[in-house]
Amino acid sequence: KKESNGEIITEMYPSMQLGGKPPQLVDQVREGVVDLIWTVAGYTPGRFPRLSVFDLPFLPTNATATAQAVQEFIETVGAEDLKDYKVIAVHVHSPGMIHTKNKLIKSLDDFKGLKLRGPTRSATALLKELGATPVGMPAPKIAPSLSKGVIDGMVVPWEIMPSFKLQELTKSHTNVAGQRGLYTTPFLFIMNKAKYESLSPAQKKVIDNNSGKSLAKHAGKLWDKFEGPARDLAAKAGGEFHTLSGAPLIEIKKAADKVVSDWIKSANKKGLDGQKLYDTAKALISK
């Protein structure tokens, strides 16, 4: 608003106040029902086949580095996935971890019999390989599902815990050792293409100046910033913590390798080079 001298004004409608369900957002913005959306790419499985590589386990580092990687990816090898939209930015959250109501995960056997919420197709595939029963649902449904016993826990990043008071509903928190986190998932901040094209050159410049890798990096930094405070709240709520390492971590990574292998095969069947996409994503994160 400031940079456009009041010409660009946005109205926010959280919690799907304009109707529909979260998976419908990408169609709403493409069709012009809304002008801008911020959503999880994984809510529409199969819609963004290249970008979904960033859902794979043991790929992300921190959100700051991974967000810049995913933005560069979508500007280059993954551009086809978002060709129908004006991309403002694509970013990720900090690596997610496992949170349960009571049972602290210390080994592969501890997953058996647990109903755990997974946010994306790759995350639910990993949970299944680990022996858990995966349950898919958007983040706002996690708290009531925990309260009603629909799920025993979930895999989410620390940052969203306080927003839904999940630290009060889960007491056991398990992370993985090493520089690569258990998982992350891309968020899309995208705009209706026709709406963008209808703007004046000066207005477009304002949007362009506040888009791309710098915005993705800023978003990643914010997620990283709130990781520690959220963990502190869980500790104050009486939470117990464990970091998987050694033999248990090796077993979990074997299960993760199966998820990665299956994703590459699936991508190849779609006419993509799954191995190249995976190697590119990994290299961009390591830059």
Can you annotate each of these PLM segments?
Residues K1-T64, E80-K287:
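N-terminal secretory/targeting leader peptides
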Residues Q68-D81:
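Signature of the catalytic double-stranded beta-helix
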